[in-house]
């Protein structure tokens, strides 16, 4: 019995170490898969947003604060910002997607601020946001070939 104690102990320690390593690698893989799923959902949501659909003839709209479309656009951007924040909670530490996801939130903040100060230009502000969103989507997709870079607002209609 004592003649095999050291080899048995080594095998047990090696097996335990291997188990911990496999569990750690599985955990890391699951984090990456969850991140990818959340990013794809976010991009799909952005693809369906009417507020991000390209406006071919933007114009000044006087009295925009009283128009329902202006209010709906702001609510949509608020929803985009909140959805993006929730996705940010699913990102891995040091994920390459953290910077573009933060950029999406900042773009939404800029849109909302611009709409507050220049509501009559609310046809122009979504186009600026759309450009920022497209750049962020491209950065996110560049880091992972399983993330589809859909155009924001292109499937809204």
Regions from the PLM with identified roles:
Residues 59-70, 91-94, 119-126:
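Alpha-helical rod/repeat scaffolding segments in eukaryotic adaptors/tethers
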Residues 95-157:
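Cytosol-/stroma-facing membrane-proximal "stalk/adaptor" domains immediately downstream
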């Amino acid at each position: 019995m004592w003649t095999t104690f050291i080899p048995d102990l080594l095998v047990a320690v090696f097996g335990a170490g291997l188990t911990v390593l496999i569990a750690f690698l599985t955990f890391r893989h699951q984090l990456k898969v969850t991140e990818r799923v959340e990013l794809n959902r976010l991009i799909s949501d952005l693809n369906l947003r009417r507020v991000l659909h390209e406006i071919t003839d933007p114009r000044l709209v006087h009295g925009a604060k009283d128009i329902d479309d202006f209010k709906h656009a702001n609510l949509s951007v608020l929803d985009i910002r909140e959805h993006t924040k929730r996705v940010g909670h699913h990102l891995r530490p040091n994920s390459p997607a953290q910077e573009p996801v933060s950029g999406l939130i900042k773009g939404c903040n800029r849109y909302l601020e611009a709409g507050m100060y220049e509501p009559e230009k609310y046809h122009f502000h979504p186009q600026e946001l759309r450009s920022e969103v497209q750049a962020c989507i491209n950065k996110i997709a560049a880091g992972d070939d399983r993330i589809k870079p859909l155009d924001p607002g292109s499937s809204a209609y």
